[in-house]
A protein has these predicted regions:
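N-terminal accessory segments
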Residues: 261, 265, 269-272, 276-280
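Intrinsic disorder at enzyme termini
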Residues: 248-262
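Structured secondary-structure scaffolds
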Residues: 1-252, 274-301
């Protein structure tokens, strides 16, 4: 990733396609005047100017009852900012000339790189939580190593350009899930595993635990049904049986959890040992998670 950033090439943001996010740029036919629109409210206001100048017959947003500043889903369902509708909007330049939208779209990777802001509608909403560091930058990002040229890069590029900040503090780069022989799964080979059938058979928690327990996220995982079955039997069944044993005798003895606490020094040695072991485990698991080592954390458990 570092080498990729060191040898960075210019990023051509535009794409000559139909489907995607339109570039919010309007130009006069001679290209002498141009305008970049920063919000739907601004676009609405510029359309009103075009209507007043006689360039547009009416405001299509107003015709549909759209209200600027109302960020509800119901309000935004009234308009469509994609092609071909947005291309029908003709604005007016400061000198009174018609302005037509740049026909290109923005690269879809720019959409991905805008995720931290777009998903919370920043800066129009959630501005305080974002600006005070609560929502940005992210603590970590998790994706495949191929995203060094994709999502990892575009997030940083936009974050640096707009805020002078990296978009995330740490990276967990996922490996691939292979078959039990280390071969890439494919329908052609017949070695692909249906995740929904696996969840139906073993449950989602044993599958999750197996995947994170078997190998570190950045290593390739040799998936084996037998491994999930073993995790389900040795870990989850043991956990369930332990709880059921406790629950049965707690109910017999009328245990509620509200009983007075016995001071630690007055407890039997084996009780103190169990509590020490538990707290050591909590400390170990917390440290491993803080160090982005979930496999070590699960194996400690």
């Amino acid at each position: 990733f570092g080498k990729w950033l060191e040898n960075l090439q210019d990023w051509n943001l535009s794409r000559s396609r139909f489907w995607g996010t339109p570039l919010p740029i309007w130009r006069t036919e001679n290209g002498a005047e141009e305008m970049c629109i920063d919000s739907v409210a601004t676009l609405y206001a510029e359309i009103e100017k075009a209507v007043a100048a006689g360039i547009m017959a009416s405001n299509p947003f107003a015709d549909k009852g759209f209200v600027p500043g109302d960020y509800s889903a119901e309000n935004y369902e009234k308009i469509d900012l994609h092609r071909p509708y947005v291309d029908d909007i003709v604005l007016v330049s400061p000198t009174g000339k018609p302005m037509y939208r740049e026909t290109d779209l923005i690269d879809v990777w720019f959409d991905s790189g805008s995720m931290p802001y777009a998903q919370i509608h920043y800066p129009f909403e959630n501005k305080d939580a974002f600006d005070n560091g609560e929502l940005f930058p992210a603590d970590f990002i998790a994706e495949g190593v191929d995203q060094t040229r994709g999502w990892f890069f575009t997030l940083h590029a936009i974050g640096t350009m707009v805020f002078g900040s990296p978009a995330f503090k740490a990276v967990v780069s996922n490996g691939l899930v292979l078959d039990k022989n280390g071969e890439k799964m494919s329908k052609r080979k017949g070695n692909a595993v249906d995740p929904f059938e696996t969840i139906e058979k073993f449950g989602s928690d044993p599958l999750r635990w197996y995947m994170i327990w078997s190998s570190s996220p950045w290593d390739n995982l040799k998936y084996d049904h037998d491994g999930v079955a073993e995790v389900s039997r040795k870990f989850f069944s043991t956990l369930s049986n332990t709880y059921n044993f406790f629950a049965m005798y707690a109910n017999v003895d009328g245990f509620t959890g509200d009983e007075p606490q016995i001071p630690l020094a007055e407890r039997p040695e084996i009780d103190r040992w169990i509590l020490s072991l538990l707290n050591t485990l909590v400390k170990t698991v917390t440290e491993e998670f803080d160090d982005y080592e979930p496999t070590r954390a699960t194996r400690a458990v």
